[in-house]
A protein has these predicted regions:
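Short, small/polar-rich loop/turn modules that mediate ligand/substrate recognition or access, typified
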Residues: 67, 72, 141-143
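Active-site loop immediately N-terminal to the catalytic Tyr-X3-Lys motif
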Residues: 40-46, 68, 118, 136
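Residue(s) in the substrate-gating loop at a strand-loop-helix junction
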Residues: 35
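Short C-terminal tail/terminal secondary-structure segment
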Residues: 40, 130-131, 142-156
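Active-site Tyr-X3-Lys motif and surrounding loop/helix of classical short-chain dehydrogenase/reductase
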Residues: 1-5, 92
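Alpha-helical segment proximal to the catalytic Tyr-Lys
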Residues: 20, 64-65, 139
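Active-site helix of classical SDR
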Residues: 15, 51, 59
Length: 156
């Protein structure tokens, strides 16, 4: 239940808080941050992927419902991003297997199918995508999902 609360219901609560002001202005942009795990579930976190799948679906519904009122809703779906969570996973692998950090990161990359760009993404790169999606330059973009994963997801 914690995965659902953190990865879906927190966004729903925030949206409920900000939507009245956006509706009053008849404009606004919401960007939800999902995860590539909704497309490729990870057995090590079985509730996380489904919660992110629900968030992605919820974003589509919100875009359709509030688009006529001038509110845009999009989803950003990161793959392997260098975060404290990714680092913690690498450290757990190091401890479990008694291997170096480089070996643990290589194991993580193999588990997710590799990253063609050869490195994890950065939080700054994800933030730049979000900034674009809330900007006027993206005024006609709504109901879309943007995968930012260095080419990892090869599914159409």
């Amino acid at each position: 239940m914690q995965a659902l609360g953190t990865n879906l219901l927190s966004a729903v609560r925030l949206d409920r808080a900000i939507l009245p002001g956006m509706l009053e202005q008849r404009s606004g942009a919401i960007v939800h941050v999902s995860s590539l795990q909704w497309k490729r579930p990870d057995p090590s976190s079985p509730a996380y992927g489904p919660a992110k799948a629900a968030l992605t679906s919820y974003s589509k519904v919100l875009a359709a419902e509030f688009g006529p009122m001038g509110i845009r809703v999009n989803t950003v779906t990161p793959g392997y991003i260098a975060t404290s969570g990714a680092e913690a996973r690498i450290r757990r692998t190091m401890d479990r297997a008694g291997i170096s950090r480089d070996e643990a990161e290589a194991e993580l990359l193999a588990t997710i199918g590799g990253v063609p760009l050869g490195r994890p993404g950065s939080a700054a790169e994800v933030a730049q995508l979000v900034a674009f999606l809330v900007s006027d330059a993206a005024a006609y973009i709504s109901g879309s999902e943007y995968v930012i994963d260095g080419g990892n997801n090869r599914v159409l």
